[in-house]
Amino acid sequence: MGKYFGTDGVRGVANKELTPELAFKIGRFGGYVLTKDTDRPKVIIGRDTRVSGHMLEGALVAGLLSTGAEVMRLGVISTPGVAYLTKALDAQAGVMISASHNPVQDNGIKFFGSDGFKLTDEQEAEIEALLDKEVDELPRPTGTNLGQVSDYFEGGQKYLQYIKQTVEEDFSGLHIALDCAHGATSSLAPYLFADLEADISTMGTSPNGMNINEGVGSTHPEGLAELVKEKGADIGLAFDGDGDRLIAVDEKGNIVDGDQIMFICAKYMKETGQLKHNTVVSTVMSNLGFYKALEANNITSDKTAVGDRYVMEEMKRGGYNLGGEQSGHIILLDYITTGDGMLSALQLVNIMKMTKKPLSELAGEMTKFPQLLVNVRVTDKKLALENEKIKEIIRVVEEEMNGDGRILVRPSGTEPLIRVMAEAPTQEVCDAYVHRIVEVVKAEVGAE
């Protein structure tokens, strides 16, 4: 990660850390790096429903126009919608203004290259080098060479028509409950599922600029679980603020997370001959029950570091077409170049329809191990990982587990924390393992 770019673009509190001045520079320098080899390049911009989106969009557009780029504004649209349209509209770059599942005061800017994929580390480093220069030496076109701006608010519909054709038949006879987090999918998802002839009930579809992710969406699926039970729905689908995540709820009101959704997709894709190299890519945070369920179905798993960009890198490297995270980022690389909540939702409902099985039965084929994650504030993350007493307690606990559980001790990527996670057959055993390790970490390198 660089000075400005984190694992998912540039993020910060809007108008404090992510200022219009910085957004202008990101537009100018980012636009230049991605389009310098093209005459009159085209750049598309989408945003979620945050109140700061208009402010940052205006600054970004100005920066891009100052390099001579033609800018097309898509309005409110999901992140995967921008990724798809960047390639579909032959744009040289796409930009999404969103902080995903973060609270309303945050916002972010992420770029997509002409192929619809997020930027490489090298491209981000090139943009950062320009941002840090004291003098802006980039060309400044004038007159008719300046860029112009246009609106293409139909882009959302073009994207919906594309993902809609990935399913085999309509969803008539199904009652689907939707939670759109008052975010980018608020008008898109209800239209999509109604268009597929499902009966729908909705929540989180009244964005006012201030309420994105507030007690709703994929990070707060409890409200959707209540709606499913109240309406007698067959399935609940919860998206996050920018629509790149999906968490589901079965017909009984049980939450179905990203690991379970990946397993359901993997099993169905294998049975129908669609799972490339018989492999699913996931992160080290996926539940042990996920790996055991894959193993029982003779499906291979490939693990990466935490973060959907690392999942994507491994998928591209190995030629795999299914990957994701427990948090609900599901990547279906045959169709879209990033995690896509609505596309994942379509596939999940399609599998229910094709197998004639309720979601509870499909998800029940994977038994989740109880899991506990505790964050310990430390003085030095590096010292913690090298500490002999910490290494010893991890070794002792792993020996006691004897393969019937899992320990993961890793540093936070952004804070002075060590994350201690365990999975075991019962919650009681799981909690005991974690607290034994946490006590040693605190005694050796604890900051409090």
UniProtKB/Swiss-Prot annotation:
Cited SUPFAM superfamilies: Phosphoglucomutase, C-terminal domain, Phosphoglucomutase, first 3 domains
Protein residues bound to Mg(2+): 100, 240, 242, 244
Keywords, alphabetical: Isomerase, Magnesium, Metal-binding, Phosphoprotein
Active site: 100
Short name of any one Pfam family annotated for the protein: PGM_PMM_III
GO MF annotation terms: magnesium ion binding; phosphoglucosamine mutase activity; phosphomannomutase activity
Cofactor: Mg(2+)
GO biological process: one example: UDP-N-acetylglucosamine biosynthetic process
Annotated coiled-coil segments of the chain: none
Record-listed Phosphoserine modification sites: 100
PROSITE patterns according to UniProt: PGM_PMM
Enzyme class: isomerase
Modification after translation (UniProt): Activated by phosphorylation.
Enzyme Commission numbers on file: 5.4.2.10
Entry GO terms, CC: cytosol
Cofactor binding, note field: Binds 1 Mg(2+) ion per subunit.
Family stated for the protein in its record: Belongs to the phosphohexose mutase family.
Function: Catalyzes the conversion of glucosamine-6-phosphate to glucosamine-1-phosphate.
Name of the protein this chain belongs to: Phosphoglucosamine mutase
